Regions:
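Short pre-active-site segment immediately N-terminal to the catalytic Zn-binding motif
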Residues: 94, 114-132
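General structural signal for secondary-structure boundaries
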Residues: 64-67, 124-125, 173-180
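Auxiliary, metal-adjacent structural segments of Zn-dependent hydrolase domains
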Residues: 7-8, 12-19, 23-26, 34-115, ...
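Fold-level signature of zinc-dependent metallopeptidase catalytic domains
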Residues: 23-36, 119-122, 151, 160-164, ...
Length: 182
């Protein structure tokens, strides 16, 4: 789903108050990976130091609208098994998007450890900052601290489970045939 656009970010220690108080971190709409990292450090300092959020490390991936449509069709999961219904879903979402019948999310979050946030490359820098604060820290902290999520899900094992499930479906198809598994 991604193309060399992964930036592993997170709270990397203290950020002096001058960097997130007063002078803006940037003034334009354009973003760079360096600027995303700078915003992440500043937002992380506020989230952790001032709001006492407890978060998993962040893995921020910047994706295109085409990749976001692909993520929609895979129900937001970064790893899945091949199935015709995902292609059907992709075509449906793509048609609605291309004809202006729907917009795309600014982000998708996988509540795992590390927390994976997919940001749209079309977002402006202010929107990227909002998404980092909302998804990479807000969702992240909420799910890390949510007792029901912890009771029924292991954030450390979500990705491994998806790999297992994909292989299980493939094994079943090989053993019983695609039609029987369908």
């Amino acid at each position: 789903m991604t193309k060399d656009t992964t930036v592993v970010l997170g709270h990397h220690g203290p950020v002096d108050n001058a960097s997130h108080r007063g002078a803006p971190l940037s003034t334009g709409a354009e973003w760079t990976f360096e600027l995303l990292a700078k915003y992440d450090r500043a937002i992380g300092a506020i989230a952790v130091d001032e709001f006492d959020l407890d978060c998993y490390p962040n893995q921020i991936e910047v994706i295109s609208s085409e990749q976001m449509l692909d993520a929609y069709s895979m129900v937001g999961l970064p790893i899945g098994y091949p199935h015709w219904s995902f292609g059907k879903s992709f075509i449906h979402h793509e048609h609605e998007y291309r004809t202006g019948m729907r917009g795309l999310a600014y982000e998708i979050v996988i509540n795992s450890n590390p927390c994976i946030a997919y940001l749209m490359e079309e977002n402006t820098m202010p929107m990227q900052a909002l998404v980092i604060a909302h998804a990479s820290y807000g969702h992240n902290s909420f799910f890390k601290g949510n007792y029901l999520f912890r009771q029924w899900t292991s954030a450390d094992a979500i990705i491994d489970y998806m790999v297992f499930a994909r292989q299980y479906v493939r094994d079943c198809e090989e053993k019983h045939g695609v039609a029987a598994v369908e």
